[in-house]
Amino acid sequence: MLALAAYLILPNLLSKKEETSNNALDQAMNNKTVYSFTKQGELTFSDAKGNFITNIDIEIADTPEKRETGLMFRDKMEQNQGMLFLFSTEEPQAFWMHNTVLPLDIIYVNSKMEVVHIAKNAKPYDDTSLPSVKPAQYVVEVNAGFSDKYGIKNGDKIVWRTE
Protein backbone atom coordinates (compact mmCIF):
# COMPACT_ATOMS: atom_id res chain seq x y z
CA MET A 1 0.00 0.00 0.00
CA LEU A 2 2.83 2.40 0.91
CA ALA A 3 4.58 1.58 -2.35
CA LEU A 4 1.39 2.38 -4.27
CA ALA A 5 1.05 5.74 -2.49
CA ALA A 6 4.69 6.57 -3.25
CA TYR A 7 4.16 5.53 -6.87
CA LEU A 8 1.19 7.87 -7.21
CA ILE A 9 2.56 10.83 -5.24
CA LEU A 10 6.28 10.92 -6.12
CA PRO A 11 5.92 11.70 -9.85
CA ASN A 12 3.53 14.55 -8.98
CA LEU A 13 6.00 16.02 -6.46
CA LEU A 14 8.89 15.74 -8.90
CA SER A 15 6.95 17.43 -11.68
CA LYS A 16 6.06 20.30 -9.31
CA LYS A 17 9.73 20.81 -8.42
CA GLU A 18 10.57 20.84 -12.12
CA GLU A 19 7.78 23.35 -12.79
CA THR A 20 9.03 25.62 -10.02
CA SER A 21 12.61 25.45 -11.26
CA ASN A 22 11.58 26.05 -14.86
CA ASN A 23 9.36 28.97 -13.83
CA ALA A 24 12.22 30.51 -11.84
CA LEU A 25 14.54 30.09 -14.80
CA ASP A 26 12.00 31.48 -17.27
CA GLN A 27 11.28 34.40 -14.99
CA ALA A 28 14.96 35.19 -14.49
CA MET A 29 15.70 34.95 -18.20
CA ASN A 30 12.64 36.97 -19.27
CA ASN A 31 13.26 39.67 -16.70
CA LYS A 32 17.02 39.52 -17.23
CA THR A 33 17.31 39.38 -13.46
CA VAL A 34 20.71 40.42 -12.18
CA TYR A 35 21.67 38.92 -8.84
CA SER A 36 24.21 40.74 -6.75
CA PHE A 37 25.75 39.79 -3.43
CA THR A 38 24.12 41.25 -0.33
CA LYS A 39 26.19 40.84 2.83
CA GLN A 40 23.99 39.57 5.68
CA GLY A 41 26.69 38.31 7.99
CA GLU A 42 30.16 36.91 8.42
CA LEU A 43 31.21 33.27 8.76
CA THR A 44 34.47 32.05 10.28
CA PHE A 45 36.17 28.72 9.60
CA SER A 46 38.41 27.25 12.31
CA ASP A 47 40.15 23.93 12.71
CA ALA A 48 39.00 21.26 15.17
CA LYS A 49 41.12 22.88 17.92
CA GLY A 50 39.55 26.29 17.35
CA ASN A 51 42.45 27.87 15.45
CA PHE A 52 41.33 30.51 12.94
CA ILE A 53 41.47 29.49 9.26
CA THR A 54 39.64 32.25 7.38
CA ASN A 55 36.39 34.15 7.24
CA ILE A 56 33.93 35.14 4.53
CA ASP A 57 31.03 37.49 4.06
CA ILE A 58 27.78 35.57 3.68
CA GLU A 59 24.31 35.80 2.29
CA ILE A 60 21.84 33.67 4.22
CA ALA A 61 19.35 31.26 2.63
CA ASP A 62 16.87 30.62 5.42
CA THR A 63 13.54 30.23 3.61
CA PRO A 64 12.43 27.52 1.17
CA GLU A 65 12.50 30.04 -1.70
CA LYS A 66 16.00 31.31 -0.88
CA ARG A 67 17.29 27.75 -0.41
CA GLU A 68 15.79 26.68 -3.75
CA THR A 69 17.36 29.56 -5.66
CA GLY A 70 20.65 29.67 -3.77
CA LEU A 71 23.44 30.88 -6.02
CA MET A 72 21.61 30.06 -9.26
CA PHE A 73 22.03 32.58 -12.07
CA ARG A 74 24.99 34.33 -10.38
CA ASP A 75 27.79 35.02 -12.81
CA LYS A 76 30.34 36.23 -10.25
CA MET A 77 31.21 35.97 -6.59
CA GLU A 78 34.29 37.26 -4.81
CA GLN A 79 36.67 34.81 -3.11
CA ASN A 80 35.72 36.14 0.32
CA GLN A 81 31.98 35.63 -0.24
CA GLY A 82 29.63 32.69 0.09
CA MET A 83 26.11 31.59 0.93
CA LEU A 84 25.03 29.90 4.16
CA PHE A 85 21.97 27.63 3.93
CA LEU A 86 20.09 27.12 7.20
CA PHE A 87 17.86 24.09 7.76
CA SER A 88 15.63 23.50 10.79
CA THR A 89 16.87 19.96 11.41
CA GLU A 90 19.99 17.90 10.91
CA GLU A 91 19.36 15.30 8.19
CA PRO A 92 20.91 14.05 4.97
CA GLN A 93 21.11 16.93 2.47
CA ALA A 94 21.76 16.91 -1.26
CA PHE A 95 22.47 19.84 -3.55
CA TRP A 96 22.76 20.13 -7.31
CA MET A 97 24.13 22.75 -9.69
CA HIS A 98 20.99 23.27 -11.80
CA ASN A 99 21.11 26.79 -13.31
CA THR A 100 24.27 27.53 -11.31
CA VAL A 101 26.81 29.35 -13.45
CA LEU A 102 29.78 29.28 -11.06
CA PRO A 103 31.75 26.17 -10.07
CA LEU A 104 31.44 25.75 -6.30
CA ASP A 105 32.68 23.92 -3.25
CA ILE A 106 29.66 22.77 -1.24
CA ILE A 107 30.52 22.37 2.44
CA TYR A 108 28.10 20.32 4.55
CA VAL A 109 28.07 21.07 8.30
CA ASN A 110 26.32 19.18 11.12
CA SER A 111 24.36 20.61 14.07
CA LYS A 112 27.60 20.80 16.11
CA MET A 113 28.97 23.22 13.47
CA GLU A 114 31.47 20.62 12.24
CA VAL A 115 32.27 20.08 8.57
CA VAL A 116 31.11 16.56 7.69
CA HIS A 117 31.63 16.54 3.91
CA ILE A 118 32.85 18.77 1.09
CA ALA A 119 31.66 18.35 -2.50
CA LYS A 120 34.62 20.02 -4.21
CA ASN A 121 34.55 21.70 -7.61
CA ALA A 122 30.87 21.10 -8.33
CA LYS A 123 30.34 21.60 -12.06
CA PRO A 124 28.11 24.40 -13.35
CA TYR A 125 24.67 23.36 -14.66
CA ASP A 126 25.16 19.74 -13.54
CA ASP A 127 21.95 18.13 -12.27
CA THR A 128 23.82 15.32 -10.50
CA SER A 129 22.88 15.06 -6.83
CA LEU A 130 25.74 15.92 -4.47
CA PRO A 131 24.82 14.29 -1.13
CA SER A 132 26.09 15.33 2.29
CA VAL A 133 27.16 11.71 3.02
CA LYS A 134 26.42 12.38 6.72
CA PRO A 135 23.52 14.34 8.23
CA ALA A 136 23.91 18.12 7.94
CA GLN A 137 21.95 21.11 9.20
CA TYR A 138 23.96 23.82 7.46
CA VAL A 139 25.55 24.14 4.04
CA VAL A 140 28.12 26.70 2.93
CA GLU A 141 28.64 27.38 -0.77
CA VAL A 142 31.87 29.08 -1.82
CA ASN A 143 33.83 29.38 -5.06
CA ALA A 144 35.42 26.15 -6.30
CA GLY A 145 38.94 25.67 -4.95
CA PHE A 146 38.23 27.59 -1.73
CA SER A 147 38.43 24.45 0.45
CA ASP A 148 41.79 23.43 -0.97
CA LYS A 149 43.18 26.98 -0.86
CA TYR A 150 42.46 27.27 2.88
CA GLY A 151 42.87 23.59 3.77
CA ILE A 152 39.29 23.23 5.00
CA LYS A 153 38.50 19.61 5.81
CA ASN A 154 36.11 17.33 7.68
CA GLY A 155 36.16 18.10 11.40
CA ASP A 156 36.81 21.82 10.92
CA LYS A 157 34.21 24.15 12.41
CA ILE A 158 32.16 27.18 11.46
CA VAL A 159 30.58 30.00 13.40
CA TRP A 160 28.68 32.97 12.00
CA ARG A 161 27.09 36.20 13.01
CA THR A 162 24.46 38.22 11.22
CA GLU A 163 24.57 41.96 10.62
What are these regions (language model features)?
Residues 6-163:
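Compact, glycine-rich, soluble single-domain proteins
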Residues 1-2:
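Hydrophobic H-region at the start of alpha-helical membrane spans
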